[in-house]
């Protein structure tokens, strides 16, 4: 019932078809936020791509300058030595090779991000059926296969988010918490959009950033006027 009231409040405050300056859009969301937990602020970006074509799928990662507000647990596959030490020093919760793989196969999968050095992928490859369905399989496109595991761990813990177009060519991503101030949320959204522009497929035609909408957890979206953002 409470959620229904909140959705109605946001819907009532939004004029159909209108775009809102970022600050106004966030104000609408925050005013209607009544949940007992700190809600996330999410963004949906409709891109001018044909997601059915492999050369127009957009996938990557962005380090949000103001972070995500979430605590991130990281596991790293790296051979013993400098790379493993580097990952531990950066704050990884677990580092290993076959020993770490065995722990995961035994059920130790309480991680938000799994990172691997290129030479550790021979071990990680055996865990595809475990990590793949959970979205944890390391991938160079999103920076989780890296020759610099320490840097990758720091990125993951400091607010790195991963994105990928869905079947409709839309990117869904979290840009922070409702408790963040407006400037922090704005800087995070701008960083994401700038990286999306850099990732624009060469074969994409017409308007690329077609629509940007922000919403609170499980709430309806409010369309953002892109001219209220700094995208250069």
Curated annotation (Swiss-Prot):
Provenance organism: Xanthomonas euvesicatoria pv. vesicatoria (strain 85-10) (Xanthomonas campestris pv. vesicatoria)
Q: Which GO terms describe its cellular component?
A: cytosolic large ribosomal subunit
Q: Name one Pfam family in it.
A: Ribosomal_L1
Keyword rRNA-binding applies: yes
Q: How does it assemble?
A: Part of the 50S ribosomal subunit.
Task: Tell me the SUPFAM superfamilies matching this sequence.
Answer: Ribosomal protein L1 (SSF56808)
Keyword RNA-binding in annotation: yes
Protein purpose: Binds directly to 23S rRNA. The L1 stalk is quite mobile in the ribosome, and is involved in E site tRNA release.
* Molecular-function GO terms, alphabetical: rRNA binding; structural constituent of ribosome; tRNA binding
Q: Name one GO biological process term.
A: regulation of translation
Q: What is this protein called?
A: Large ribosomal subunit protein uL1
| Keywords, ordered alphabetically | Repressor, Ribonucleoprotein, Ribosomal protein, RNA-binding, rRNA-binding, Translation regulation, tRNA-binding
